[in-house]
């Protein structure tokens, strides 16, 4: 079967299956895993390639897999519709809307391949934001300017800031102070 002959829901179902199996591997970042002797143990392909192979092979999906795909698609469409109405769609989100609403093609597969990971990242980000919103009311400044402290903190979030090539690490000290 060709990608063009499949349905968008089949591609979403394949994306969920691949993500659940191997997490998210960006296009072009496939690799080999080796054992201690240097022998190839397995090839890890990027998600887009795995999804394309699954669709082209004619894989059929269970009712449960299709239900999960429909739920993910409906959830994303709902969020994107609200953003579209308020004029707040970024370029990626506009491509998501296009990929989910038009006939499947290779570009749509590449966009849909990232959706399960994007949803997982959004859920994590929401949880971190909720926690930070709660903590900002109890968080207090401690220490003196110019001094160093050796403290134990709980790491809550690590973000890579691409424009600065640095990591922003957010932690919590004593369960109440944001560091």
Residue ranges and their predicted role:
Residues 3-7, 17-127:
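Long, charge-rich alpha-helical interaction segments
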Residues 28, 124, 158-164, 178:
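An almost-null, non-specific background feature
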Residues 165-179:
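Beta-strand/loop nucleic-acid-binding surfaces
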Residues 129-166:
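Structural detector for short beta-strands of small beta-barrel domains
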């Amino acid at each position: 079967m060709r990608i063009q002959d499949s349905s968008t829901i089949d591609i979403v179902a394949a994306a969920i299956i691949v993500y659940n199996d191997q997490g998210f591997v960006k296009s072009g970042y496939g690799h080999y895993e080796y054992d201690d002797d240097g022998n190839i143990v397995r090839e890890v392909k990027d998600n887009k390639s795995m999804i394309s192979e699954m669709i082209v092979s004619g894989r059929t999906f269970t009712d449960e897999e299709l239900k999960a795909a429909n739920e993910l698609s409906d959830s994303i469409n709902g969020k994107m519709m609200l953003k579209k109405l308020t004029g707040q769609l970024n370029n990626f989100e506009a491509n998501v809307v296009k990929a989910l609403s038009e006939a499947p093609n290779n570009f749509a597969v590449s966009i849909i391949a990232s959706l399960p990971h994007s949803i997982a990242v959004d859920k994590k980000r929401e949880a971190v934001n909720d926690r930070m919103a709660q903590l900002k009311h109890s968080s207090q400044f401690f220490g003196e300017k110019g001094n160093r402290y050796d403290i134990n903190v709980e790491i809550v979030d690590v973000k890579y800031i691409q424009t600065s090539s640095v990591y922003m690490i957010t932690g919590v000290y004593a369960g109440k102070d944001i560091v």
